[in-house]
A protein has these predicted regions:
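Alpha-carbonic anhydrase
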Residues: 4-9, 13, 17-339
């Protein structure tokens, strides 16, 4: 087991040094360039899209077409272990002076460099968070408007990514679609099905032996983040502030500085729920595996007008859902079928 972990970390470092990777950008695996914004060379459609990532660099991007624990995946109730937010010791200080906001060509990214999280016996520092449109992970087969990826790194270069779904305000006077409120939508509506999907996840009985196998070192006493017990039901002030500057970085390679960012709101929202966790991969080239994923059951929301502003800059930037963990890579299987 130790040997396989060492190999994964070696490959992760080797691959990330050879390719542009949004997911790992700003970490020790792929340091941020001083004084400029590097524009990614891969894409999401045509000859540079996910089905062609292998051919952009066959040696570096081999895992994109052969890896068997690839991300994103469909987040289905009971498929992966659940971790209460109270076990993550999640702390992110406010960025009162604002921070850099960059257009990498394939996403827009907020530079962090501060914030702490602990998973099992490993401590992580928040490096950056970026966005995908639509969501890369699925919620029981359904995509969401967007997904935020918060990229964390440990002292020994292990990577963890916190995924947070982002909904668009429904325009009905407050609650965003998909979030739970005191006035629940009818059970047959899409909003209710999204809501009930997360409720099912949180209520599925745990197989503790299964949890221990997937999550060594998680358990015992952990610091509990004090937070309200309900998810945010209005557009996120944090996201509205960040995206308020998105028009300033409409061109790849540009950057600006955000206004003051209140991270406490985000911490409170995440701390109100749990995370479905699994070991997967970067969702961008080189698709390296050994990445710890923690996908929150709490959704954020933005205004419809904000969504359109972001969409005009990002466009489409989602990798297609991958097969079940441990199964043959879809691209590899298809290649063998047509030989």
């Amino acid at each position: 087991m130790a040997g396989s972990i060492t190999l994964r970390l070696f490959l992760l470092g080797a691959f990330a040094s050879q390719a542009m990777a949004s997911c790992a950008y700003g970490t020790l695996l792929h340091p941020r360039a001083e004084g400029k914004v590097e524009v990614n060379t891969f894409g999401y459609t045509g000859k540079t899209g996910p089905t062609s990532w292998l051919f952009l660099d066959p040696e570096a991007n081999a895992m994109c077409a052969t890896g068997t624990n690839q991300s994103p995946i469909d987040m289905v109730a009971g498929e992966n272990a659940m971790v209460p937010a109270s076990q993550l010791n999640l702390e992110i200080p406010d960025m009162t002076e604002g921070t850099e906001f960059e257009n990498l060509g394939t996403t827009v990214e907020v530079v962090a460099g501060q914030g702490s999280m602990r998973f099992g016996n490993t401590s992580y520092t928040l490096q950056q968070f970026h966005f995908h449109l639509p969501s890369e992970h699925l919620d029981a087969g359904k995509s969401m408007a967007m997904e935020m990826h918060m990229v964390w790194e440990s002292a020994d270069s292990q990577i963890a990514v916190v995924g947070v779904f982002i909904d668009v305000e429904d325009g009905a006077g407050g609650s965003p679609a998909g979030n739970s409120t005191s006035s629940q939508p009818p059970a047959s509506t899409p909003q209710a099905r999204k809501r009930d999907s997360f409720k099912m996840r949180r209520s599925v009985p745990h197989n503790h032996d299964h949890d221990k196998r997937q999550l060594p070192g998680v358990g015992g006493s952990f610091f509990h983040v004090n937070a309200p017990t309900t998810a945010a039901t209005t557009p996120s002030n944090l996201l509205e502030t960040v995206f308020g500057s998105v028009g300033e970085i409409s061109e790849p390679g540009t950057l600006t500085k955000t206004k003051s960012l209140n991270m406490a709101e985000l911490v409170s929202t995440l701390a109100a729920g749990s995370f479905q966790t699994y070991e997967g991969s970067l969702t961008t080239p080189p698709c390296s595996e050994g990445v710890r994923w923690l996908v929150s059951d709490q959704k954020l929301s933005i205004k419809t007008s904000t969504f359109h502003s972001v969409q005009s800059v990002i466009g489409f930037n989602s990798r297609f859902p991958q097969g079940a963990l441990g199964e043959p890579n879809t691209l590899d299987a298809l290649a063998k079928m047509v030989r």
